[in-house]
């Protein structure tokens, strides 16, 4: 389970402003995305390991007669597991015999990849994360027999059960001990390891598996089962961002990383990799700022992103980040209300997905100064890949000429609306670019675009 936030589109959107003959569709979103819950829910991956948990067969005891060869993760991950997954979910085993369960699972899985997968799916669908024990700090007996009997476990129990079933089904496997960026993990903390996961050999090559993080999330101190296939045969270059093994050979990477490097990286989740996002200009979790910061990400066309600035786990709705897309990149511009330490939370989803935005990436930004506030953007801005050239500050000089320049693909017309006077001023169109000098009044100013024939305009940007 990893740090993860979900947002939903706000049902009670800001009411539209109607002017005779014209309808403005106002849908306020942070950088083009509306959220149902401004505070949101934090879904967490817990630390849940102590040496006293008695791991039954960890990598310290693993005797290898051959070199550790990393597997072809793409080949194993992209296998056709639809039938195996369906069978694993249908097995309603109520007993407490490891051998009996292994025999049942083996009936449906013939190859080593199928065996590794059916164990993963069965455990993630049948073992519940023991939140109560975690919160008490007393994790109890993590032996595979007890875990199977009680159907509750923290990470060591998940890892032990996976290991025991793998062994009984003829797979070479072990428990990996290390550090995971879950709840309470302190960067730079040199204390004992806090997590356990598995390594398994498939066709003479090794793969990494975390059934705990694949089982679900914890929300408001309640476990929510939420199967995540990402943590089955996770590519080592992705898992290293969140999992650091004590024995570095189980990074399964050609280059070995130090824990100091692990601690320095941003917090990224499975959503980050699922949506094909890549870091461009900030590879460290901690960023220093002088009032305004830009984070640049490589984002595929099919991925939508949004962002939120937080302080002390609370959203700062007065300073919404500005996200602009250009040349396959998303530029996230953040301004800070005052000097201090902040969290920049980035969320993503596939454009075709009607579900929530999920937490993809986090940075900790420390600013030594107050930043100039930036304009507020609306849903239509992001949906149409608009790009604002000027002005890029939220507070405009009153009763003065202001140069407006904005690129809005697909727009038939763009206007500047002075909400204090009700004046509408069209901008000059040149291809997808709209520009012009407009005298602004003393109230809010809105940039709105028309995308269909008729008199309907949608809000793009708002100034104070």
Task: Spell out what each predicted region is.
Residues 47-61:
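Short extracytoplasmic/periplasmic juxtamembrane "stem" segments immediately C-terminal to an N-terminal membrane anchor
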Residues 58-154, 160-164, 169:
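Secondary-structure boundary elements
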Residues 1-16:
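N-terminal Lys/Arg-rich, disordered targeting/topogenic segments
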Residues 32-47:
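Hydrophobic single-pass membrane-insertion segments
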